[in-house]
């Protein structure tokens, strides 16, 4: 075991957070608050105050002293937190300006901007200006980076003044705020800190780019920028802004984007000068730079010829593996001509990414491609583009419809779509009757999210009237007052309110906010269709069939095709899919007539059709389709003087439950129609594989025709259906669902923007938990392409500003890294290397383990707000839950007491979705944690449960360790992390979802799930089993009956003696969830028994269930160990005698019975 690594990490982290503190405050005083052991408990006391430098020297002296490593770790673990006293409250913004000046001076002493960089920046600036002039008619005033005062002068209507001069409103100007979880000056200071500690490692090119970016940051910082303060007020009043002649519209965004480019400067491999070009272009065309600079990738992926290997895959989607043979290269003249023509017309000729692309078409090495690909990912980090909702939605739904279409093709499309839907709906109605006795109320309402219902109305909440838009509260209001909520059609005809979504490099998109009735009606239909698609129905055409455990390798078939180059791969992109003509009348009438036809097919009568709250699901579905065919969209821009807009719309509504799966069906029907018509003129085409995902599609085919002929013909066929498409064809590369598959390798872009966000962060979460999710996103970017140096840099930027908690105006607590990297309201819930959950302790001493458990658990606080309990006893809540309970009882044909209690608990938790309730919960938790910290002398009881790493250490102490042989292997699924690669080389890559040892079968859970309309989790079973006396037959019988199990099933289950086995499995079900192994690059590891046995060989007489649980615990701990230390091993544990064996087995079983697993906010099911 490697305590040295842990010691080095812990000391470095404490020192880093301290030196950052001394950088951003003037003369702070710091004092250690230490833990003292007092047999039963620990108590804390504060030591004398020092300067941060003195404290850093003290920590340094501990690390360099001659005591043992374990004692050094103990000395550092005893630091519970460090109090920081700040007397001089001078403005941090002035300090940041001094730091900026100092940093720029320091870089200038080392280098100056070369002609090469200067030319690159000037050239792209001129090209961006020209592009702006040529495309000016499509620009809105807020797309120009102009003075805010000029914008206000000509666009008064974009603003609403408030009573408080700092509380004015403007949708448009608010869209220009970057939304980060710290103030802009704090971001700059942490970027300066992270670069300063690496200063000696930069090469000349990196220094030049740093100089350029820091100068841009300084210019915008000195000129001033508009920001929204934490108290939700603006930094400037309108009067100030009208007078100010230096604040530009995009200043804050340019600062944040420049900071992002400084972070990507640490990616390996990358073209440094291109990052400067991104900012130069972004300063000129802020709303369009990302899209324009990234666009050549779509074409390049189809023509670049990588040096790679042939990939073979079986017809099982998930199986694919690279062979030794080199891949086959294939590029036709017509493809090169198309590329050259496009590139000659490309407006940004000086883009260094495009220059690299032009040089690298044939025989490209993976490293060069990675550099180009990372440049492409970098363009998205300038942040989210936010347009005014009215302008964006108007552009989104504008489509010219025509009657001049190919009638025959339209008929084919309509009949195909109708036939597919008819078969599905007939099955759906029968399944609901046999499974739930036709009442699907409980399932539909249980799945309903507490999102907006589109408009605000007054409802009673506990003891007060509140105005709210929440679906749940509207539903409760309707039910408790017995209002008529069944004429959905009329409601939709009044108009559909619109929301928006923002993404980097794309225009703002509108989202339809439909009423709760639509969600309730469509839920079971959508679920049924998804389930069918997931099981690989419809010839495994739907991407949903590929999202199960091995999502990572489902693109195996496509990887194989691109490596052999024997099939033509066609990916078509329909622009404005939702509003296209085939999605208007044909799509809606296919749904309506499919329902009518399905009714003639099934064996149940009208009264047995599924119902929700007394409404017939199929009747209402027809009503919804009819209403949506010709709907009015209401688009408001509330933070402006713009009048609400009403727009006539006929397309698909993104906001229905059935949108995505409905799109996939329509897409299959559309492609099939196009190809049926194509084979008349091109009989040599043989379609091999088809995959759709919403409006995305890919088809692979064998053909004797030329590639450009096929492309032209396809476009022409789509045109005859009035669908505007880009049809891209290639033999060796394609893009689907944001993944790029080229010559047998799969790349994912690291395009998660960290320093900007789509919406402002809620005030209800602590800075620590938002920072945790940012570290997680940074880790995903690093694993996908930017590499380990980028992740280290990002933790240095993200952690120090979030490492301290404000206690009073002058006092802050700088938390111990151990507390920060654990779970709870003041923790990141993530490890420094990007795995979700708690940082592990790599130390073998028992005393250190005790200290460590205290530091990780004393702040894990959870509070249930009173309002949840109060609301659950109101008539409004009762109205909803009573309807749901009676629906469960009809569906299960029994009382099902436990199921109905679980239902009530789950519905109670939804009250958290009400504004203020969640905020109250999180604020109370944070306050309690702060109080816990501020008590000077506090007694902390010791933790008696075992942490999983204690089992890991126990096995290691009793094993012989050897260095494993790592297999070198060719990657299909690309990642850029040394340690993930090591893990893959030792335990392999998940190549199939086939022969792994499955999660042991929990028969009890299966029986309950079979009948229960609501989702039941294993922990629910454990909780309720404690309320029954399971030692005698009657207790067991009552428990099972209350779960809704009866008749023969009950008899057989009782006789099978499986109850205790299943309850044990339920207890450890959490082990089958890997906390936050969400980066797909980690999901490519086969986290199962076979993999565990490659690392651990354990010959102990353990019962089978315990053996599996032990192996899983060891495997997760091993993944954490390798990701942290970068070392691998193989462990063999064979006890020398029977006595030792018996003793070990007893200890292990006790530990597993008393294990304490992380409770985390996010986790992934990996089985």
Swiss-Prot record:
Swiss-Prot/TrEMBL catalytic activity: RNA(n) + a ribonucleoside 5'-triphosphate = RNA(n+1) + diphosphate
InterPro entries documented for this protein: DNA/RNA_pol_sf (IPR043502), RNA-dir_pol_luteovirus (IPR001795), RNA-dir_pol_reovirus (IPR007097)
Subcellular localization, as worded in the UniProt entry: Virion
Enzyme nomenclature, EC number: 2.7.7.48
Principal EC category: transferase
Gene Ontology BP, a term: viral genome replication
Keywords: Nucleotide-binding, Nucleotidyltransferase, RNA-binding, RNA-directed RNA polymerase, Transferase, Viral RNA replication, Virion
GO molecular function: nucleotide binding; RNA binding; RNA-directed RNA polymerase activity
Transmembrane segments annotated in the record for this chain: none
Highest rank taxon of the organism: Viruses
Known role: RNA-directed RNA polymerase that is involved in both transcription and genome replication. Together with VP3 capping enzyme, forms an enzyme complex positioned near the channels situated at each of the five-fold vertices of the core. Following infection, the outermost layer of the virus is lost, leaving a double-layered particle (DLP) made up of the core and VP6 shell. VP1 then catalyzes the transcription of fully conservative plus-strand genomic RNAs that are extruded through the DLP's channels into the cytoplasm where they function as mRNAs for translation of viral proteins.
Family: Belongs to the reoviridae RNA-directed RNA polymerase family.
Record protein name field: RNA-directed RNA polymerase
């Amino acid at each position: 075991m490697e305590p040295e690594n842990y010691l080095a990490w812990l000391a470095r982290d404490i020192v880093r957070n301290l030196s950052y503190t001394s950088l951003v405050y003037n003369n702070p005083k710091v004092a250690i608050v230490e833990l003292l052991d007092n047999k039963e408990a620990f108590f804390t006391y504060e030591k004398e105050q020092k300067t941060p430098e003195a404290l850093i020297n003290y920590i340094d002296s501990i690390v360099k002293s001659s005591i043992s490593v374990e004692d050094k770790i103990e000395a550092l673990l005893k630091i519970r937190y460090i109090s920081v006293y700040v007397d001089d409250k001078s403005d941090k913004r002035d300090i940041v300006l001094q730091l900026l000046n100092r940093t720029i001076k320091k870089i200038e002493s080392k280098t100056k901007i070369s002609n090469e960089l200067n030319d690159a920046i000037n050239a792209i600036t001129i090209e961006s200006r020209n592009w702006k002039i040529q495309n000016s008619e499509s620009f809105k005033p807020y797309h120009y980076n102009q003075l805010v005062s000029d914008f206000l002068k000509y666009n008064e209507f974009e603003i609403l003044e408030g009573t408080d001069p700092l509380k004015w409103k403007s949708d448009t100007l608010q869209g220009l705020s970057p939304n980060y979880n710290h103030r802009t000056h704090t971001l700059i200071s942490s970027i300066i800190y992270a670069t300063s500690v690496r200063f000696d490692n930069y090469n000349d090119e990196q220094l030049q780019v740093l100089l350029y970016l820091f100068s841009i940051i300084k210019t915008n910082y000195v000129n001033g920028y508009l920001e929204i303060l934490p108290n939700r007020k603006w930094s400037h009043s309108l009067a100030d802004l009208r007078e100010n002649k230096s604040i530009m519209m995009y200043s804050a965004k340019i600062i944040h984007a420049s900071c992002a480019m400084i972070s990507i400067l640490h990616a390996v491999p990358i073209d440094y000068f291109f990052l400067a070009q991104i900012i130069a272009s972004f300063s000129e065309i802020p709303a369009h730079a990302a899209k324009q600079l990234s666009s050549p990738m779509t074409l390049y992926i189809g023509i670049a010829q990588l040096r790679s290997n042939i990939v073979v895959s079986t017809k099982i989607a998930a199986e694919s593996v690279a062979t030794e043979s080199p891949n086959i290269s294939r590029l036709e003249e017509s493809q090169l001509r198309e590329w050259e023509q496009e590139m000659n017309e490309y407006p940004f000729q000086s883009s260094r990414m495009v220059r690299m692309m032009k040089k690298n078409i044939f025989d490209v090495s993976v490293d060069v491609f990675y550099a180009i690909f990372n440049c492409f990912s970098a363009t998205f980090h300038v942040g989210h583009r936010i347009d005014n909702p009215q302008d964006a939605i108007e552009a989104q739904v504008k489509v010219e419809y025509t009657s001049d279409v190919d009638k025959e093709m339209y008929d084919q499309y309509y009949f195909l779509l109708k036939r597919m839907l008819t078969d599905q709906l007939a099955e759906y109605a029968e399944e609901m009757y046999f499974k739930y006795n036709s009442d699907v109320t409980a399932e539909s309402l249980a799945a309903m999210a507490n999102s907006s219902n589109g408009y605000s109305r007054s409802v009673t909440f506990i003891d007060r009237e509140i105005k709210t838009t929440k679906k749940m509260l509207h539903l409760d209001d309707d039910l408790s007052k017995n209002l008529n909520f069944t004429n959905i059609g009329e409601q939709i005809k009044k108009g559909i309110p619109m929301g928006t979504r923002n993404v980097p490099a794309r225009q703002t998109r509108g989202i339809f906010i439909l009423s709760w009735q639509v969600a309730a009606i469509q839920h079971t239909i959508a679920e049924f269709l998804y389930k069918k698609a997931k099981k690989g129905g419809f010839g495994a055409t739907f991407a949903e069939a590929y999202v199960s455990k091995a999502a990572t390798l489902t693109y195996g078939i496509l990887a194989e095709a691109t490596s052999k180059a024997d099939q033509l791969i066609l990916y078509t992109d329909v622009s404005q899919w939702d509003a296209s003509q085939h999605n208007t009348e044909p799509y809606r009438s296919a749904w309506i007539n499919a329902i009518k036809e399905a009714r003639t097919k099934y064996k149940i009568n009208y009264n047995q059709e599924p119902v929700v709250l007394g409404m017939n699901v199929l009747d209402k579905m027809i009503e919804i389709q009819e209403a949506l065919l010709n709907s009015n969209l209401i688009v408001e821009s509330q933070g402006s003087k713009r009048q609400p807009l009403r727009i006539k719309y006929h397309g698909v509504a993104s906001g229905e439950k059935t949108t995505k799966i409905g799109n996939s069906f329509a897409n299959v029907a559309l492609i099939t129609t196009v190809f049926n018509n194509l084979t008349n003129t091109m009989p040599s085409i043989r379609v091999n594989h088809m995959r759709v995902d919403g409006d995305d599609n890919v088809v692979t085919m064998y053909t004797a025709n030329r590639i450009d002929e096929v492309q032209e013909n396809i476009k022409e066929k789509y045109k005859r259906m009035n669908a505007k498409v880009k049809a891209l064809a290639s033999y060796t590369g394609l893009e689907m669902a944001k993944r790029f598959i080229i010559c047998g390798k799969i790349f994912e872009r690291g395009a998660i923007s960290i320093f900007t966000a789509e919406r402002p962060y809620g005030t209800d979460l602590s800075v620590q938990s938002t920072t945790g999710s940012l570290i997680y996103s940074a880790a995903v970017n690093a694993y996908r392409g930017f590499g380990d140096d980028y992740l280290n840099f990002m933790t240095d930027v993200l952690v120090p500003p979030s490492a301290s908690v404000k206690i009073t105006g002058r006092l802050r607590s700088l938390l111990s890294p151990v507390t920060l990297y654990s779970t709870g309201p003041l923790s990141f819930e993530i490890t420094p290397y990007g795995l979700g959950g708690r940082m592990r302790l790599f130390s073998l001493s028992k005393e250190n383990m005790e200290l460590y458990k205290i530091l990780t658990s004393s702040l894990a606080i959870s509070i249930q707000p009173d309002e949840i309990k109060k609301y659950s006893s109101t008539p409004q809540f009762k109205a909803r839950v009573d309807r749901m309970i009676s629906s469960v009882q009809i569906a299960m044909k029994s009382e099902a007491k436990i199921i109905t209690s679980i239902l009530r608990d789950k519905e109670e938790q939804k009250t958290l979705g009400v504004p203020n309730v969640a905020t109250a919960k999180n604020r109370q938790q944070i306050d309690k944690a702060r109080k816990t910290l501020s008590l000077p002398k506090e007694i902390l009881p010791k933790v008696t449960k075992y942490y999983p790493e204690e089992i890991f250490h126990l096995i290691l102490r009793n094993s012989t360790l050897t260095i494993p042989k790592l297999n070198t292997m060719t990657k299909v699924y690309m990642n850029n992390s040394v340690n993930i690669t090591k893990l893959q080389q030792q335990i392999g890559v998940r190549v199939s979802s086939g022969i792994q040892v499955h999660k042991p079968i929990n028969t009890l859970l299966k029986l309950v799930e079979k009948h229960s309309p609501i989702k039941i989790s294993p922990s629910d079973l454990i909780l309720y089993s404690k309320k029954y006396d399971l030692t005698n037959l009657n207790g067991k019988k009552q428990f099972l009956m209350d779960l809704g199990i009866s008749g023969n099933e009950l008899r057989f289950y009782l006789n099978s003696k499986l109850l205790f086995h299943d309850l044990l499995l339920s207890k450890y079900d959490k082990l089958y969830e890997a906390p936050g192994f969400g980066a797909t690059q980690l999901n490519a590891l086969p986290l199962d028994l076979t993999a565990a046995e490659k690392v651990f060989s354990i010959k102990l007489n353990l019962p089978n269930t315990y053996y599996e649980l032990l192996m899983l615990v060891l495997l997760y701990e091993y993944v954490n160990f390798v990701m942290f230390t970068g070392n691998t091993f193989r462990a063999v544990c064979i006890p020398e005698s029977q006595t030792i064996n018996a003793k070990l087995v007893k200890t292990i079983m006790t530990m597993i019975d008393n294990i304490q697993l992380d409770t985390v906010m996010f986790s992934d099911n990996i089985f």
